[in-house]
Amino acid sequence: YTPVSDVNLLAIYRYYSPYYSNPYANALCSWSRMRDEHGGYIGLEYNKLKNWQLSTFADVWKNGYEVMAQGDWLPKQNYHMHMRFRVKEKDEACTYSLRWNMAYQMGRWKMKTQADGNLVKGALTYGWSVLQDVEYRFSGFPIVVQMRAQFFDAREWTNRIYIDEHDVLYAYAMPFVYGIGGRFLLNARYKIND
C-alpha cells in the first residue's frame, strides 16, 4: 500500500494450521517450516529524504518477535552506505545484531567493506565479523576478478554470522561463520562471447 508517493506500507497476517504440511512451500514464517503458526508482519519504507531510504519492519508470532530498522545513504551513483539494526526474540533468547557496509566504485575497481556484530542477551555471548571485497574489471579482456578477506570471532553457535557471497553464475550463497578464524576467497568470471 502506498498512501503517499514516498511511503510504502505492507501488512500481512498469517495462519498455518497444525495439520498443514508442505515440504516445498516458501512463505513468510518464523521457522523453516510452515506449520502451526500465526502472526503478523508490518513493514514501512520511507523515501522522502534526499539520498536516503529508510525502512523498518516488525514480525510478531506466538512465541517471539523480530524488529528491524535500516537506513541506506546514496549520496552519489558510485557510493552506497548501509546500516541495519535487528532485535529477535525466539526460544527465550534475545539477539541484537548490527550490520554496517559501505560500497564504492572507482573506475574499474569496486570495493565493499562490511562489519557485522551480534549479542545474545540470555547467554551474554557475542560475535563479530569484518570483511573487505575487491573487484576488478580488466580493460579489453572479458574477465572480472573478485577477492575477499574476512576475519571473524563468533565462538558460540548462537552467534553465527551469515554473509552473502558470489558463487558460480546465476547462483547465490549465504554461508555462516562461527568460531575464530578467517576466510579468503578468489573468484574469476570470464565472458566467452563478449
Could you describe each region identified by the protein language model?
Residues 1-194:
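Exposed, low-structure sequence patches enriched in small/polar residues
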